[in-house]
């Protein structure tokens, strides 16, 4: 690892768990992350997205029966799907927002990409998603805690400016595999480029 942040993630991992910092999830490259998150005119138009309103819309939605796994999500969620994004599997302890050491290197590589000049002037939403196990209201809160945990690690450990990251939990409201709502692929974290800050 040549980058400062990859070395920091590896050092933290090795010190705390006493093993190599290799990542069982497979390796993300900084270049692939930059390519996925590179800004576009669409991202710039999305910069005025109101994340507080998005949270309120999702909270209202989970109160309504029959909206689980709905084929047509609300417009705000449809807009998120069109933004430059990166989806990663971040491992958490069960029913917890504690990030497992196996994912620290992944977060370090993401931090390297966010420090790259092509992305440095942009703002991002860190979106937490869950599967459909459990109650929707609980999953919404858990996904928010997990998105907050990833954001906090990027800020405190990898020195990403706090104003560049907004954490939003969507619970099970945007399943990646709607045919298998309890599948592990639905438990994920997304990074969305919402344009210049």
Predicted segments, located by residue:
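Generic anion/oxyanion-binding catalytic loop in active/binding sites
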Residues: 13, 96, 115, 136, ...
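Short coil/turn segments at secondary-structure junctions
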Residues: 90-98, 133-138
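Periplasmic peptidoglycan-binding/anchoring modules of Gram-negative envelope and division proteins
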Residues: 71, 76, 81, 85, ...
């Amino acid at each position: 690892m040549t980058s400062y942040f990859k070395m920091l993630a590896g050092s933290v991992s090795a010190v705390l768990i006493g093993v190599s910092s290799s990542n069982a999830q497979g390796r993300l490259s900084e270049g692939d992350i930059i390519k996925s998150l590179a800004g576009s005119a669409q991202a710039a138009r999305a910069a005025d997205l109101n994340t507080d309103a998005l949270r309120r819309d999702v909270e209202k939605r989970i109160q309504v029966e029959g909206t689980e796994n709905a084929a047509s999500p609300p417009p705000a969620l449809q807009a998120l799907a069109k933004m430059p994004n990166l989806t990663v599997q971040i491992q958490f302890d069960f029913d917890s927002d504690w990030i497992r050491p196996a994912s620290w290197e992944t977060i370090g590589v993401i931090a390297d990409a966010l420090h790259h000049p092509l992305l440095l002037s942009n703002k991002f939403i860190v979106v937490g998603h869950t599967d459909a196990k459990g109650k929707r209201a609980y999953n919404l809160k858990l996904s928010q805690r997990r998105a907050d945990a990833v954001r906090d690690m990027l800020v405190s450990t990898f020195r990403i400016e706090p104003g560049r990251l907004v954490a939003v939990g969507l619970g099970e409201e945007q399943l990646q595999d709607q045919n298998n709502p309890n599948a592990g692929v639905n438990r994920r974290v997304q990074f969305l480029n919402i344009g210049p800050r």
